[in-house]
């Protein structure tokens, strides 16, 4: 659980804030003995992280742009727990090209918006050691399967539609590892 969502014991569960309170992290880490800490700085699970009302429209692309992550909260947590591994749940970027492919081939993902990659790059350069992006892989897989079924409606062999899905997910993860998450070339370290 993110610390803003549910803390240890029923007396410390869910409150109204969507962000982690940096004043609570030392107590939480001490009481739980956790070896990493998922904090809330404006991320959320799924492909619908923000409402259209929370976003503004980029005039150059016509796409919705979400509000920035609360890096001041991340900085305050890092100050309270220097060097402690931080995790970000719900950090999918919701690649618009995958959303567009899904919608082109019969999907109905309206106003699906994620965390901009530049925000994730910034987080990856901090104490954040793990950034969860599962919705991105689901979108990549779904887009490839929908496209295959639309272009080859008689196809029923899973090897024929799961292969392109796997390839699309691999392409996505290579991009994220190399260009976004700062996880490439870590084996030598």
Which residues make up each language-model segment?
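Single conserved hydrophobic/aromatic residue that forms the stacking wall/gate
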Residues: 1-9, 13-14
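Glycine-rich tight-turn/loop motif centered on a GG-T
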Residues: 11, 15-23, 47-71, 105-110, ...
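A general structural motif
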Residues: 18-21, 29-32, 41, 64-73, ...
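Short, well-ordered coil/turn segments that N-cap beta-strands
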Residues: 33-35, 82-85, 129
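Non-cysteine beta-strand/loop elements that form the S-adenosyl-L-methionine
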Residues: 34-42, 133-134
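Conserved, mostly hydrophobic/aromatic
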Residues: 37, 89, 123
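Alpha-helix-loop-beta-strand connector modules within alpha/beta enzyme cores
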Residues: 61-88, 98
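C-terminal alpha-helical cap/extension of soluble enzyme domains
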Residues: 104, 115-189
